[in-house]
Amino acid sequence: MTPSEFRQSVRRGAFRGPTAGHCGPFAQANLAILPDAYAHDFLRFCQANPKACPLLGVGEPGAFRIAALGEDLDIRTDVPSYNVYRDGRLTERVESLEALWQDDFVVFAIGCSFSFEDMLAREGIGLRHVEEGRNVPMYRTSIANRRAGIFGGQLVVSMRPLRGADAIRAVQITSRFPGVHGAPIHIGHPRELGIDDLNAPEFGDAVTIRDGELPVFWACGVTPQTALMDAKLPIAIAHTPGHMLMTDITNASLAVF
């Protein structure tokens, strides 16, 4: 299935699940959508936190298309599920933004680690959340983001359990893709990140960690949602964690070496 066909299936309501493992050679994007009055500070926030918030594209005020991501793409309808935040609280999850769209909304598309999973799989590195049919586990850490204006919050990480040799290979592979979070930020000791229980992720689903495996943590594009909650904007919208925007950007084009 091409990215365009995948987006069409989302748009007509045929697909509503997590997007990991779909359209493998193509990049997926996290979303943050907020009023134009706050967009400059949020842009500075992304620039100050590039590991968690690598920008793939930024829309014009009111625009629900970013041509660089896909010609037939509609931000309002092409994500399986959206989180709506009001005054810093998650108030609802919706399957379309058509009724909520505002002329001053600015869209930020942020790189997603699902994008490099195809590269890991090609190297024979198993991905437990894909194997188990679950959403990737994501955890809010005790690490504060670099603040920019009203935006702060805490770093969120995704976790994939890997054997030592696979973890080393994963570092080598993912370091080539800083536009989709790059290399892991930590391996092996979740308490050093302020994570007490790997079986209780704040976002996504817990996965099986087998004997001899290490938890490998990548900076995650859900991080901006902690910043949106911290800022307590009157309204802000993001993808539901694990439910991404499929783009026409090839993963190979994002490699820096």
Curated annotation (Swiss-Prot):
Alphabetized Gene3D superfamilies for the sequence: PSTPO5379-like, PSTPO5379-like domain
E.C. designation(s): 4.2.1.-
Keyword Lyase recorded: yes
Keyword line: Lyase
InterPro entries, sorted: D-Glu_cyclase (IPR009906), Putative_hydro-lyase (IPR038021), UPF0317 (IPR016938)
Stored NCBIfam families: PRK05463.1
Protein name per Swiss-Prot or TrEMBL: Putative hydro-lyase BceJ2315_40370
